[in-house]
Amino acid sequence: MSTTTDFVGRNCPHCSAVDSLQTDDVMGEVACTACALVVAMGLEENVFTRYNENATYEDVDHHRERNANPTAATSAAGSLSAADPHMSSTSSKVVLHPTMLNCMRGLHKKAVLPEPVLDRGIELARAFVGGRRARGQRVERQPDVAAACLMIAAEEAQQPLPLAEVRCLDSSLGDVELRRADIVRELHLEDSERRLRDTFADNLLVKYILKLGLQVSLYLPHCKRLLTALGRVEALAGLTVADRVTTALLLARTAQTLSWEQGTHISKGKECDLGMEAIYANFSSKAHLEVTKVNKIMHLAVDVLPLIQAAFQDCGEPTAGKRKVDKNSEPEASGGTKRVKREET
């Protein structure tokens, strides 16, 4: 059952007002502050804040201990302080400029990221700003630094925040990639940065698949195979990793790429009845991307669709070493099991 936290950061479905939904955890209702309409009612109360008349002191203590334990994102933040034992005590005393804090909190709320991601981003920003101030250096373009810190924190929590999404959420940002390179060099995060880049595509694929409400076990291996095929097409060499992820997922939904595999048949879903422009717009709204950019990328991919299909077939089947039954073989008398042979590749 849905809770009030599921509506945080969403737009009003009636008047389309941006970030106008106000939640009431006690009444279990969500209302819009712009059109004054109740969006949802009868929602389940948060399990961590609901009143339990049968609760004991042991339950309360267990709840406090659980909140005190670090989560996956906050435990990853320990790698920074472990590299430099003096960094945690020094960075905790650094006071960030309100511009940087407001930018980071705004992006965090619009992107609907977990709270530990914001804490990790603030810790990275304090460590970076504290190091610059200790050497008497200025911190230029503080909003860009805040966005870069939040991007690193989101990738560490396996919820990547691509640059295109960041620019869509805040169009006033500048060269965020340059500030991110400065942060990585300043905090000695080169090894962590390489690991994040290796897992960026897979984590972003899972994030987009879940946003669209699709089956991960079906779309993830298929889209990864499409990513490999897109990398072999020279006409798409200028696309970034995030653009290729977007192209692979939308091709899997619109170009019937699942039927490209031999012996695979799929039924037409509701998205087949819609136009491609509507599918692109729906994905752009859920992924916080600009519709014009998504349309431009997909039009480029559709123009070279035969090349993508040829590269897709050359990539081979997703599951290597697939077995098939030999029709000419007879079942054994002992176990009644047919002899099988491995396909020659």
Curated annotation (Swiss-Prot):
The entry's stated outcome for residue 270 to A is: Moderate loss of SLRNA gene transcription
Q: Which CDD domains match?
A: CYCLIN_SF
GO MF term set: RNA polymerase II complex binding; RNA polymerase II general transcription initiation factor activity; RNA polymerase III general transcription initiation factor activity; RNA polymerase III type 3 promoter sequence-specific DNA binding; zinc ion binding
| Chief subcellular location | nucleus
Following inactivation of the gene, the phenotype reported is: RNAi-mediated knockdown in the procyclic form is lethal. Reduces SLRNA gene transcription. Reduces, to a lesser extent, RNA polymerase II-mediated synthesis of alpha-tubulin and HSP70 mRNAs.
Query: Where, subcellularly, is it found?
Result: Nucleus
Q: Where are the zinc fingers (TFIIB-type)?
A: 8-40
* Listed Low complexity bias regions: 71-83
Q: Give the region (Disordered) as residue ranges.
A: 59-89, 318-345
Keywords (alphabetical) are:
DNA-binding, Metal-binding, Nucleus, Transcription, Transcription regulation, Zinc, Zinc-finger
Record field: transmembrane:
none
For whether the record's keyword set contains Iron, the answer is no
- Listed result of changing residue 194 to A: Moderate loss of SLRNA gene transcription
- Source organism's superkingdom? Eukaryota
Outcome (variant: residue 292 to A): No effect on SLRNA gene transcription
GO biological process terms, alphabetically, are: transcription initiation at RNA polymerase II promoter; transcription preinitiation complex assembly
Quick one: which residues bind Zn(2+)?
Answer: 12, 15, 32, 35
A GO CC annotation recorded here is:
transcription preinitiation complex
Swapping residue 268 to A leads to an effect described as: Moderate loss of SLRNA gene transcription
Output the PANTHER family linked to this UniProt entry: TRANSCRIPTION FACTOR IIIB 90 KDA SUBUNIT (PTHR11618:SF4), TRANSCRIPTION INITIATION FACTOR IIB-RELATED (PTHR11618)
Q: Which proteins does it associate with, and in what oligomeric form?
A: Monomer. Interacts with RNA polymerase II subunits RPB1 and RPB2. Interacts with TBP; the interaction is direct.
Q: Of which family is this protein a member?
A: Belongs to the TFIIB family.
* Functional note: Specifically binds to the promoter of the spliced leader (SL) RNA gene and thus is essential for SLRNA transcription.
Q: What is this protein called?
A: Transcription initiation factor IIB
Native species of this protein? Trypanosoma brucei brucei
Lineage, uppermost ranks: Eukaryota, Discoba, Euglenozoa, Kinetoplastea, Metakinetoplastina
Protein's gene: tf2b
